[in-house]
Amino acid sequence: MRNTLLKPILSLSVLMGAGGYFTQGYAEDIVIVDGLWKISYIENDHAFRVNVLNEDGSARKCLFTRSASEAVYDNVAGESRTVTPASFADIKQTEEKVNDEFGTGTSYTFTFTRPDNGDDVQMVQRFCVYEENDFLITDLSIEGDEAIRSNYLAPVSVSQMYVLFSESEDNRMLKVPFDNDGWTRYNKYKMNTSMTSYEVTAWFNGETKEGIVIGAVDHDHWKNAISVEASDNGRVNVLKVYSGASTSETRDVLPHGKLKGPKISSARMFVGFADDWRTGMETFARANTMVQPMRDTWDKGTPFGWQSWGVLEKKNSFDADVEIADYYHEVLKPNGFVNSQGMQIIGIDSWDNLSTDERIKLCKEGGENGQTVGLYFTPFSWWWGWSDKMGSTQYTAEDCFLKVNGEPYSLGGAICLDPTHPGTKSWISTRIQEMKKQGFRFLKLDFTSHGMVQADSYYAKGVTTAMEAYNNGLSYLTKVVDEGDEPMFLSFSISPLFPYHYGNSRRVGCDTWADIGQTEYCMNAISGGWWTDLLYQYNDPDHLVMVGSGGWGSPKNCTLGENRARFTSGAVTGMMMVADNFALNDDSGNGDAALSRARAQEIMMNKDINEMADLGRSFMPVYGHKEHNGNADAAETCFMHHTEEYLYVAVFNYTDGESSGSIPLSGLDIALGDFDTVKELWSGETVVVDGEELSYKVPAKDVKVFRFHKKPGSGIADAMSEGGKDARLDVHILPGSNGGLEMNIDSSAPLRKIDVFDLQGRLLKSQNVRGLYNACVALSPVKGLLLLRACLQEGQVLLAKAMVH
């Protein structure tokens, strides 16, 4: 049962008076207990404290305390003001039922009025607790005249030290990069430094896996960040969770743009506590898709194919493209390098060097081979003449440039275009219509970060922030792309992580090539960002190269072990676009076609690895805090993924010497009796697991991939009851809100928890129901077989399957 305790309503009824307001300084603390959450407003501190509780109501963890939410705004006179709860004389606490993207629940609202600066404004903080989800949502608003402006709102703002975890070197803070440019990396810092993470972060203990996840679920107006100063491997000294980020890491020079009144709200912030922080990150991703579903328009399976930039680069040619496409169709496809739908992609990148007729012919011949042909486009970056006409308009490129401090602004050698400008949009429309007419159905979008720069102003009225401009431009682009019967696959390259819903895929890192250092860089992104494949249909490891062009990171003499490692990094990330020059008749000098074809025999024709890659999923780090060299920005070595039939475990070695070790089976979420055989997929050898650990030895610059075959009836393979014969479970699937689903569960015994998985074993939803016989689980749009695990109050587990058509 849900229990809400509002102490001030009882003890301060005289002071509160009509309307429920009371004067700060004369009140007791406000304490709200709702499910597993305890939200307190501490009067003496003029600040909030949020605790998570155990099932019995006892305290479990203080997530943050002395949080004096902070708003910076310009008043009607244009004067800059900063306010916190202590700035206001009065506070009113109310509650109301909510029914939004996250389900039904209660919104607890704190309204602060009569600021000491004399402005006619009020500050409002909401905490929303939901019946069907174990996270809470909070946001902060400043309200007043329509003339007010704000570019900084911090729903969580802590400036006094508190203990988050007991001191341990296993405690970590996750830094998520804003974009993937400049070889940015995910970091997992020990809790003895400062960092700023963008859009989301996690604090966790690597051994217990217990963790806190905080991040934004709205990405329409603001760039968001979480800044932390930590010490003593467990203490938080400063914590700011805010909308209004503007740093060199967001590619900005100007301060964040100001939003306009009369009501300005921060992004809604997800606050979650999880027994396993990795599950918490996945829950955060799914919470985002409740607000904005992913772009899942691609129905032709996991991308397997070729990409021209990895080796041919600027020396691409029509003849090489045709020869390579034929090689893929005639040799690689029959030998297993193809997805389960028989589809391959031929991706032509920048510097395609193709005439219009050659483009049309390449698409036609590819279609006859069952191949989808792709092209390259940079919608928001300009590399050409300033006086060039834009699309069908009379605007020149210069008319469309974004300006910073009055001057055209460039990143990486290209000038940034205003995504909202009609000239930019006409150019985008003209180019995309041309490509679609020529037959391209796969489009790589590069340098989209150029459209996410804070500028002096934007063409579109009402657009004042970089995030608004970016959304404006990409919503137009996807509208043009999706016109017609056959949508295009949109593959985002250099781009921000959020917003995510415009791309079918996104590169997990910057340019990534062939050698073991490139593999390590790719796996760094999966170590910290595997969960992003719940935002995108596919995570993209960039072009997979075996025999390079001879440039940095792309030597011609990589070892077979390095080839295996790089190929595997693609298989455990989500896409398989190999980029070698396989054209024997090409005389560009880039690559070595004969050697690449020889390597393809040993690497690309491994059907077990290709079958694993066809899952199109990113593998989860086994540990989450064991970087291979002890550095915060390094990759981990061990990754895993469960399906109904198999457990896959990939172990990388990024070093010059052999590595060996063992992984406890408990860390792989499998028991000794749950599987019958283990096969190492690169050697084909059967592996004997004697005790409670998987032992491994990996040669220098190489990888091992272990596949556990699950016994029938293990895990959630069969819809049968575990322990007890009397309990019964009935499941019904109904249409839900926002195109989603509602799973209605009727149980003959009181329920404690519901877990819903897809056929690959990925957790889609976990919901505590605490003693109910009936439960309704809201799901994002999904099709196929769903697997349900219902944990009863008495400890029994019931399993069921449900098909969604």
Residue spans of the language-model regions?
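Beta-strand-rich recognition/accessory modules
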Residues: 33, 194-300, 557, 697-698
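Acidic, contiguous internal or C-terminal segments within carbohydrate-active enzymes
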Residues: 106-167
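Substrate-binding cleft of carbohydrate-active enzyme catalytic domains
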Residues: 301-455, 469, 476-484, 490
